[in-house]
Amino acid sequence: MTILINDSTLRDGQHAVKHQLTAAQLRSYATAADKTGVAIVEVGHGNGLGASSYQVGRAALSDEEMLTTVRESLQNSKMGVFMLPGWGTIADLTKALAYGTDVVRIGTHCTEATLAERHLGWLREQGAEAHAVLMMSHMASPAELADQAELLVGYGAQAVGIMDSAGSLLPQDVTARITAMRMQVKVPLIFHAHNNLGMAVANSLAAVQAGAGIIDGCARGFGAGAGNTQLEVLIPVLERLGFNTGIDLYHFLDAADLAARELMVVPPMIDSLGIVSGLAGVFSGFKSPVLNHAGSAGVDARDVFFELGRRQIIAGQEDLIVEVVAELKRAAS
């Protein structure tokens, strides 16, 4: 069985550097990744097309600059983009296709697949390759996710899947979710992990063994919070288990070394807040804003994460961090 690898280094990795990757960094990594045989190289603001903003962070480059830079660097791999309806629009998708995007992935909250209907339909009308993912998948049951996936396929998605956005799932949770989806839809299934509880590689293997055919990851795990699935670990493990990735290991190890040298300020690690984020079920990308607001207010950041988890906060609601910090400070005084 062939497993397609979606390399999210230049998109999810943006979270780790506050969306400040430069054109030179994008070009350097994309060129290296293109030599590996990886199927898709994903690029953009960490939150996707149209997301560069005060609320979730201004990117160093515009979407146009990011996409054109990477497009020029790819000869073999497809270029992928990610978009969340509400941040991105049909106008953003139009531009992305004009800049040479090969694969568009639309993301929604795990119970809000209907938000992707218009965008997926439009993409299919354009003849574009359209995928869709359900985010924060720990917040929905396997049956609910399968129903949502069926809706996405009905809207035109040619591959569907789930993101463990908070790094909260364990292998048995992944197996149950992918198995339920596999029984209900016939298109390829996608899995995207975060490593808050140290489960990213194990969860990705569980997804593949349950029937997923497209797996996300990043060189050196470079991504939000505790990072993503570390591709240079996952790839040889998949091959050892008898799955084909089509990726040259030495070339990918070289790309990962380059990423460590040129893209990262500090390598991803599972620190105390990463663990708390995973346990609380809060999006990994909240780490920096929680630290900033909690630190300035003298509030324990761990308490902030658990309260955000209790409220079931999702990506895009970063403004509520300020509210939670203020309430915790008042309660302590």
From Swiss-Prot:
<feature type="site" description="Transition state stabilizer">
    <location>
        <position position="11"/>
    </location>
</feature>
<dbReference type="Pfam" id="PF00682">
    <property type="entry name" value="HMGL-like"/>
</dbReference>
<feature type="binding site">
    <location>
        <position position="194"/>
    </location>
    <ligand>
        <name>Mn(2+)</name>
    </ligand>
</feature>
<feature type="binding site">
    <location>
        <position position="192"/>
    </location>
    <ligand>
        <name>substrate</name>
    </ligand>
</feature>
<feature type="active site" description="Proton acceptor">
    <location>
        <position position="15"/>
    </location>
</feature>
<dbReference type="GO" id="GO:0030145">
    <property type="term" value="F:manganese ion binding"/>
</dbReference>
<dbReference type="InterPro" id="IPR017629">
    <property type="entry name" value="4OH_2_O-val_aldolase"/>
</dbReference>
<dbReference type="InterPro" id="IPR035685">
    <property type="entry name" value="DRE_TIM_HOA"/>
</dbReference>
<protein>
    <recommendedName>
        <fullName>4-hydroxy-2-oxovalerate aldolase</fullName>
        <ecNumber>4.1.3.39</ecNumber>
    </recommendedName>
</protein>
<dbReference type="InterPro" id="IPR012425">
    <property type="entry name" value="DmpG_comm"/>
</dbReference>
<comment type="similarity">
    <text>Belongs to the 4-hydroxy-2-oxovalerate aldolase family.</text>
</comment>
<dbReference type="InterPro" id="IPR000891">
    <property type="entry name" value="PYR_CT"/>
</dbReference>
<dbReference type="GO" id="GO:0008701">
    <property type="term" value="F:4-hydroxy-2-oxovalerate aldolase activity"/>
</dbReference>
<dbReference type="InterPro" id="IPR013785">
    <property type="entry name" value="Aldolase_TIM"/>
</dbReference>
<feature type="binding site">
    <location>
        <begin position="11"/>
        <end position="12"/>
    </location>
    <ligand>
        <name>substrate</name>
    </ligand>
</feature>
<dbReference type="GO" id="GO:0019380">
    <property type="term" value="P:3-phenylpropionate catabolic process"/>
</dbReference>
<dbReference type="Pfam" id="PF07836">
    <property type="entry name" value="DmpG_comm"/>
</dbReference>
<dbReference type="GO" id="GO:0003852">
    <property type="term" value="F:2-isopropylmalate synthase activity"/>
</dbReference>
<dbReference type="GO" id="GO:0009098">
    <property type="term" value="P:L-leucine biosynthetic process"/>
</dbReference>
<comment type="subunit">
    <text>Interacts with MhpF.</text>
</comment>
<keyword id="KW-0479">Metal-binding</keyword>
<feature type="binding site">
    <location>
        <position position="192"/>
    </location>
    <ligand>
        <name>Mn(2+)</name>
    </ligand>
</feature>
<feature type="binding site">
    <location>
        <position position="12"/>
    </location>
    <ligand>
        <name>Mn(2+)</name>
    </ligand>
</feature>
<keyword id="KW-0456">Lyase</keyword>
<feature type="domain" description="Pyruvate carboxyltransferase">
    <location>
        <begin position="3"/>
        <end position="253"/>
    </location>
</feature>
<keyword id="KW-0464">Manganese</keyword>
<comment type="function">
    <text>Catalyzes the retro-aldol cleavage of 4-hydroxy-2-oxopentanoate to pyruvate and acetaldehyde. Is involved in the meta-cleavage pathway for the degradation of aromatic compounds.</text>
</comment>
<feature type="binding site">
    <location>
        <position position="165"/>
    </location>
    <ligand>
        <name>substrate</name>
    </ligand>
</feature>
<comment type="pathway">
    <text>Aromatic compound metabolism; 3-phenylpropanoate degradation.</text>
</comment>
<dbReference type="InterPro" id="IPR050073">
    <property type="entry name" value="2-IPM_HCS-like"/>
</dbReference>
<keyword id="KW-0058">Aromatic hydrocarbons catabolism</keyword>
